[in-house]
Amino acid sequence: APAVKYLLKNQLVDQDHLARLPGQGAQVCGGGACCSPEINESLRKAGTTSLGEVVRSTALSLHSALTSHRDTFYGVVESALANSEHRALNVFQATYPRLAPAARQVLHDLYSALRVGLTDTDDRALENAMGTFWDDLFPPVYHSVLHARLAPFSRRYTECLRDAQRVVQPWGIVPTLVGEPLLRGLHSARLLLHSLDVGAQVVKTASNFAVPSECGDAAARMQYCGACHGTLAPPCPGMCLNVARGCLAPLAEVDGAWADLAGAVSRVQQSLQAVRLAQLLHQLPDKLSEAVMVALERGPQLQKKVRRDCSNPTHDDTSHSMYHLPVFTVEGVAAAAAASAGEERGSGRVLESAGAAVRAVDAGREWWAGLPDTHCNNL
């Protein structure tokens, strides 16, 4: 009979069991082809598995989408940072060739710290990266401007210059003009990445949802008892939804928190649209160059302020120069030129990938609320 074949196909009964019918103890389906204790247990497990599987399979699909969008967005922002770094090296080499070798490592450290700051748990990691950059840039700039023909500064004097930078303020208001909008954009990107990570972790946890034991009997009665009595009629839709909603109720409670997450992600997207992060990163090299120019123009004033805080300079008495760093390469110039041409495309990619991530989070809202319907539609 078709019903018996269905039971055999789903491994709810086997031929040996059928040969022993009729049996005793049909607690789940009340007799028929399923009346034995071992089949009752098999039915309970099958009912529990049926409910759990719809959660696992759909959760893993949503988890994959969230992590994919997260990785794509990070890749786009990281690419914008890399392009900005290449362009910064080009600008410094063209504008300050004497300073460029020493500035190269300082610039590299800045962009590396910004990349790390995008995913750092420390809320002030990005601000610290910018502050450290201005501290580190001052010693080579001051050496290049006032003492270019002398030996490198001693380590102690270099540290004094780093500490004095925030008092001397050699860059004028450029750090504020550069830092505030750039940090807003980077913090928005960081918040989006964090939100996607949180969403993916919540969904991953949900994929391991343990179906309550009492739901095994209800799911089995709904899905398999008809076959036990010789019919393959599908379960009543109303009964199916009632069982699924009751058994999956703990997951539905997440819907409210997920709505809050979706709202936060949407606001982050709006912030990214306002600040135009890729454009800010493209303009950053010019702003850094402008800061150095401000320091150059203030050379005599800087010297007075520095000597007040650090006295006369002391120099390294060895032939090793702490500013001797790898020279700027032709390949780097070419890469920077290509990066400049891609500014507009970079802005579009950041916003496009952010929008796709927001849509994925919105889709998650439907997932939490729609699990019972998904389960019943799959039967």
Language model regions located:
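Membrane-targeting and insertion segments and their boundary/processing signals
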Residues: 80-84, 104, 166, 173, ...
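Hydrophobic, helix-prone linear segments
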Residues: 161-168, 180
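Eukaryotic N-terminal, low-complexity and coiled-coil-prone scaffolding/targeting segments
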Residues: 1-161, 350, 357, 373-374, ...
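Eukaryotic terminal intrinsically disordered regions
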Residues: 1-48, 55, 66, 255-379
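Acidic, low-complexity intrinsically disordered regions
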Residues: 130, 167, 254, 363-364
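Extended amphipathic alpha-helical scaffold segments
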Residues: 91-98, 111-152, 176-277, 289, ...
